[in-house]
Amino acid sequence: MKKGIHPELKKAKIVCACGAVYETLSTKEYMTVEICSKCHPFFTGQRKFVDTEGRVERFTKKYNWEIK
């Protein structure tokens, strides 16, 4: 590797919306994430309800579809 062209790595603190905190190396010192392995449905085995009604309504209005 060439010297002097790579960004400096620092200890990074990553905080999830569920409250989980992770430490790793990164060029940034602090990051926030919305979902992690402690709260993601794939890893927890639970399903979470995601409100997508606004997106569906926008789609049906855009393409003039009727919901049956």
Curated annotation (Swiss-Prot):
Q: Is Ribonucleoprotein one of the keywords?
A: yes
Task: State the Pfam families in the record.
Answer: Ribosomal_L31
Cofactor dependency: Zn(2+)
Give the cofactor note text. Binds 1 zinc ion per subunit.
Which InterPro entries has this protein been placed in? Ribosomal_bL28/bL31-like_sf, Ribosomal_bL31, Ribosomal_bL31_A, Ribosomal_bL31_sf
Residues engaged in binding Zn(2+): C16, C18, C36, C39
GO terms (BP aspect): translation
**One GO molecular-function entry:** rRNA binding
Query: From which domain of life does this come?
Result: Bacteria
> GO CC: one term?
ribonucleoprotein complex
Kindly state which keywords UniProt assigns to this record, in alphabetical order. Answer: Metal-binding, Ribonucleoprotein, Ribosomal protein, RNA-binding, rRNA-binding, Zinc
Please name the PANTHER family in this protein's record: 50S RIBOSOMAL PROTEIN L31, CHLOROPLASTIC, LARGE RIBOSOMAL SUBUNIT PROTEIN BL31C
Role this protein plays: Binds the 23S rRNA.
Subunit structure, as described in the record: Part of the 50S ribosomal subunit.
> HAMAP family, from UniProt?
Ribosomal_bL31_1 (MF_00501)
Recorded family membership: Belongs to the bacterial ribosomal protein bL31 family. Type A subfamily.
Its protein name is Large ribosomal subunit protein bL31
